């Protein structure tokens, strides 16, 4: 029975050694992954300022577009109001002309 226990112990020691090597490999690969992730994060942080700059740029463009649209709307509204006034003046004068023609 001592031979079987020694065989068992040898197999157990070999398996423990394989497990140890595998764990070391996993730890090594996790370290590499950690470095890669840290590098990616640092590169991403470098673009934060550039991203904010572009965001401000597009916000400014949108504000300009909104102002231009409001100005055009205001001009169109004023133009429509002026057209209405001038058309009523035209109608008023034509009514007066009709009244004068009828008197004559």
UniProtKB/Swiss-Prot annotation:
Protein localization: Nucleus; Cytoplasm, Cytoskeleton, Spindle; Chromosome, Centromere, Kinetochore
Basic and acidic residues: compositionally biased ranges: 65-78
Compositional bias per record (Acidic residues), positions renumbered to this chain: 95-104
One GO MF term: microtubule plus-end binding
GO biological process annotation, one example: attachment of spindle microtubules to kinetochore
UniProt keyword annotations, A-Z: Cell cycle, Cell division, Centromere, Chromosome, Chromosome partition, Cytoplasm, Cytoskeleton, Kinetochore, Microtubule, Mitosis, Nucleus
Main location: nucleus
InterPro entries the record matches: DASH_Dad1
A Pfam cross-reference name: DASH_Dad1
Top-rank taxon: Eukaryota
Protein task: Component of the DASH complex that connects microtubules with kinetochores and couples microtubule depolymerisation to chromosome movement; it is involved in retrieving kinetochores to the spindle poles before their re-orientation on the spindle in early mitosis and allows microtubule depolymerization to pull chromosomes apart and resist detachment during anaphase.
PANTHER family: DASH COMPLEX SUBUNIT DAD1
Subunit note: Component of the DASH complex consisting of ASK1, DAD1, DAD2, DAD3, DAD4, DAM1, DUO1, HSK3, SPC19 and SPC34, with a stoichiometry of one copy of each subunit per complex. Multiple DASH complexes oligomerize to form a ring that encircles spindle microtubules and organizes the rod-like NDC80 complexes of the outer kinetochore. DASH complex oligomerization strengthens microtubule attachments. On cytoplasmic microtubules, DASH complexes appear to form patches instead of rings.
Recorded family membership: Belongs to the DASH complex DAD1 family.
Name by which UniProt lists this protein: DASH complex subunit DAD1
Origin species: Debaryomyces hansenii (strain ATCC 36239 / CBS 767 / BCRC 21394 / JCM 1990 / NBRC 0083 / IGC 2968)
Organism classification: Eukaryota, Fungi, Dikarya, Ascomycota, Saccharomycotina
């Amino acid at each position: 029975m001592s031979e079987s226990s020694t065989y068992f112990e040898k197999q157990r020691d070999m398996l423990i050694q394989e497990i140890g090597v595998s764990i070391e490999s996993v730890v090594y690969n996790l370290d590499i992954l950690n470095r890669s992730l840290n590098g990616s994060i640092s590169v991403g942080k470098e673009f934060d300022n550039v991203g904010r700059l572009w965001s401000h740029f597009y916000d400014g463009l949108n504000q300009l577009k909104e102002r231009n649209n409001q100005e055009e709307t205001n001009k169109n509204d004023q133009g429509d109001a002026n057209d209405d006034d001038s058309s009523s003046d035209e109608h008023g004068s034509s009514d007066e002309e009709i009244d004068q023609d009828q008197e004559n």
